[in-house]
Amino acid sequence: MEEDDSYVPSDLTAEERQELENIRRRKQELLADIQRLKDEIAEVANEIENLGSTEERKNMQRNKQVAMGRKKFNMDPKKGIQFLIENDLLKNTCEDIAQFLYKGEGLNKTAIGDYLGERDEFNIQVLHAFVELHEFTDLNLVQALRQFLWSFRLPGEAQKIDRMMEAFAQRYCQCNNGVFQSTDTCYVLSFAIIMLNTSLHNPNVKDKPTVERFIAMNRGINDGGDLPEELLRNLYESIKNEPFKIPEDDGNDLTHTFFNPDREGWLLKLGGGRVKTWKRRWFILTDNCLYYFEYTTDKEPRGIIPLENLSIREVEDSKKPNCFELYIPDNKDQVIKACKTEADGRVVEGNHTVYRISAPTPEEKEEWIKCIKAAISRDPFYEMLAARKKKVSSTKRH
């Protein structure tokens, strides 16, 4: 039963009545205070709840935008970076962008390589900041290259590779003072190691270099002097025992090679066996090589024809129109260095002294000849490396 606050017993003195009234008033004040505190607590709890969900929403929105930025970067690196900067997810500084690329979370390593290889002044600054994030102190050159080449995928263009490997050589020499006479020596040896890796571990390369040949190839590159034989032997053994782990992103290495070909299309190829038959093949011209496939959807080519040291000419053929040939100038009987995959999956050397090919139309024949001629005459990567090698070999130590 609720107490009636208005009831006053009749036997109380005036003083007791006053005391009772004071107690009752204080009680009402306390009840009002308690209610006010309850209301305040409820309000604060509500605010905390709203604040939590607002923060959560903000984080979710931010994560969504970062994911979108990564996707954009993987499709178009410059647009992706621009999007992240515009949405305050990345600072517009070479250091911040380099850190983002170095962490590489969710990023396609081919896209990282393309961005770092650009020749814009800002991209070059990002490249140097990116290389600075790598710690190469006390690593031998193969160990440093393993770390570096895993952080992105080297692009195909010679000038881009040159800039990136130059930055690597500078950083390696900075971390390991005194190992090489100059950054040029480090640069040339780095390429020698990358090419050694290909020669030793590519099944299409039949002639595997020995350690003696590797040492001989690198004579005189240390500003005119030789590098210690033990160093070269160690580097050779390291690569022989464990090939470089190259980022693949989307399928195998070759898939990437065929993304931006110089030219592609259906052609007829005359077989090199005893019975000469014409076979329809899908040809792709890229990276100074002519690849041919049975179907456009095949990931692995049926054959590879390196264009180095070859020439091209138009020819007449009694059976097929619009023909041209690949051949070795001044040596008509020499077999062209090439390889093909047999039906059982074995990779064998080709046996052609010439490759005769027929195009569907005269226009396509002209276009193929023009593109192949351009590929044969242009090999800036090897020209660039040869020039650097000549420079370090001819330098005399003072």
From Swiss-Prot:
Is Cell membrane included in the keywords of this UniProt record?
A: yes
Write out the ranges of the annotated region (C-terminal autoinhibitory region).
Answer: 388-396
**Which tissues is this protein detected in according to the database?**
Ubiquitous.
Effect the entry attributes to changing residue 157 to A/K: Reduces guanine exchange factor activity by over 90%
Binding positions (a 1,2-diacyl-sn-glycero-3-phospho-(1D-myo-inositol-3,4,5-trisphosphate)): 269-277, 281, 292, 302, 351
Which InterPro entries does the entry link to? PH-like_dom_sf, PH_domain, Sec7_C_sf, Sec7_dom, Sec7_dom_sf
Q: Does Amino-acid biosynthesis appear among the keywords?
A: no
Coiled coil regions in record: 10-67
Q: Where is the PH domain?
A: 260-377
Q: How is it modified after translation?
A: Ubiquitinated by SCF(FBXW11) E3 ubiquitin-protein ligase complex. Ubiquitination induces proteasomal degradation.
List the PROSITE patterns hit by this protein, alphabetically. Answer: PH_DOMAIN, SEC7
The source's superkingdom equals Eukaryota
- Name any one GO molecular function: guanyl-nucleotide exchange factor activity
Q: Which GO terms describe its biological process?
A: establishment of epithelial cell polarity; regulation of ARF protein signal transduction; regulation of cell adhesion; vesicle-mediated transport
Membrane topology of the entry: Peripheral membrane protein
Q: How does it assemble?
A: Interacts with TRIM23 and CYTIP. Interacts (via coiled-coil domain) with FRMD4A (via coiled-coil domain). Interacts with FRMD4B. Found in a complex with PARD3, CYTH1 and FRMD4A. Interacts (via N-terminal domain) with INAVA (via N-terminal domain).
The name under which this protein is listed is Cytohesin-1
Species assigned in the record = Homo sapiens
